[in-house]
Amino acid sequence: MTEAMNITLSTQPADARWGEKATYSINNDGITLHLNGSDDLGLIQRAARKIDGLGIKHVTLAGEGWDTDRSWAFWAGYKGPKGTRKIEWANLDEAGQKELESRLMIIDWVRDTINAPAEELGPEQLAQRAVDLLCKAAGDKMSYRITKGEDLREQNYMGLHTVGRGSERPPVLLALDYNPTGDKQAPVYACLVGKGITFDTGGYSLKQSAFMDSMKSDMGGAATITGALAFAITRGLNKRVKLYLCCADNMVSGNAFKLGDIIRYRNGKNVEVMNTDAEGRLVLADGLIDASAQKPELIIDMATLTGAAKTALGNDYHALFTFDDKLASRLMASAAAENEPFWRLPLAEFHRSQLPSNFAELNNTASAAYPAGASTAAGFLSHFVENYHEGWLHIDCSATYRKAGVEQWSAGATGLGVRTIANLLTAE
């Protein structure tokens, strides 16, 4: 066992020999991080990334100043997808310790689940992992149903079945009910819907390798929103919430769906498929139909839905779309409280009509005349939300995963978004 490296905090600048912009310095007692009052959490996270890069895999957070958020910021930057790391944590009060332990259990679960190879994490495995996490968080206050394969077709979950039928691993719908009072007549406060594409080849609209190599992470929306529900429960969520995970592989085979196919949904909408790589919206539609049927106050869907959102925001922000300005303000307030990055992008009534088809009511992708791809994708989803003007949030989660490490994050999943959605669910 290696001896732990002490990591301490200071509000004094580093010795001039380290340079005027030095954020950390090394001394006989260990490593000191020099906080300057400007984005201290970001400074700690970036310093932790550098410390990990030095090959230091065992540290102690020593001295004063280590609260819950600073401790978590260090771990967010220190954690990576390879190897093991050990932290001796600073002493926190009971509430702070409980919060840190919840983050370690749940947000690490989200990061590790998204990072898992697709070979190990198919649709059924993803649904079962979600059930296991929520059982741990909620105990007997939850119930669930898993529907898969041909049962989906028989029950008219045609979007999910159509996308997933081309894989040897059957598509799966997880419907989970968190009901803390146990009253079967209790109203549903919120419905959460997650895109769980466990690997996305693009189907017959095949991706290039450079765009396919990270597609094990295309279930990032499902993992993140599952983590958000679990985290809200650990923070005392006392309202009924239902979760729908739409899980499938998007593969090429003799049974895979094709361009020109028409999907007929339970709500009466018909959709022509003109791009099999725009599959996420097709599976989410089924979950949104179920969510709308519950008449909740709030519907939130999360999906790694479009490259257009990444073009606009990079991997630095989650993109928020909604017609509900008050709800957008609440979400942004939750994001600010949790120090997580969200950015609102446009969604207007005209985006709903930018999906023309010659053979169906809707096309699953906009034509070249309508290049706002993230907004038209949100417009598509709105056709499956009964009251889309109020109480609906669509999150195109661009900040879920990074193909390469940066100064603040290792390569792989970030876990961003879990705390914001949990905050929104538990806010009074």
Swiss-Prot record:
CC terms in the record's Gene Ontology section: cytoplasm
EC number(s) on file: 3.4.11.23
Gene Ontology MF terms in the entry: manganese ion binding; metalloaminopeptidase activity
Catalytic activity: Release of an N-terminal amino acid, Xaa, from a peptide or arylamide. Xaa is preferably Glu or Asp but may be other amino acids, including Leu, Met, His, Cys and Gln
Binding residue positions for Mn(2+) 1: 200, 277, 279
Active site: 207, 281
Chief subcellular location: cytoplasm
Names of the cofactor(s): Mn(2+)
UniProt xrefs under InterPro entries: Leucine_aapep/pepB (IPR011356), M17_PepB-like_N (IPR047620), Pept_M17_PepB (IPR008330), Peptidase_M17_C (IPR000819)
UniProtKB keywords: Aminopeptidase, Cytoplasm, Hydrolase, Manganese, Metal-binding, Protease
Cofactor note: Binds 2 manganese ions per subunit.
Superkingdom of origin organism: Bacteria
Entry binding sites for Mn(2+) 2: 195, 200, 218, 279
PANTHER family for the chain: LEUCINE AMINOPEPTIDASE-RELATED (PTHR11963), PEPTIDASE B (PTHR11963:SF20)
Biological role: Probably plays an important role in intracellular peptide degradation.
Protein name (Swiss-Prot/TrEMBL): Peptidase B
Organism field: Enterobacter sp. (strain 638)
Gene for this chain: pepB
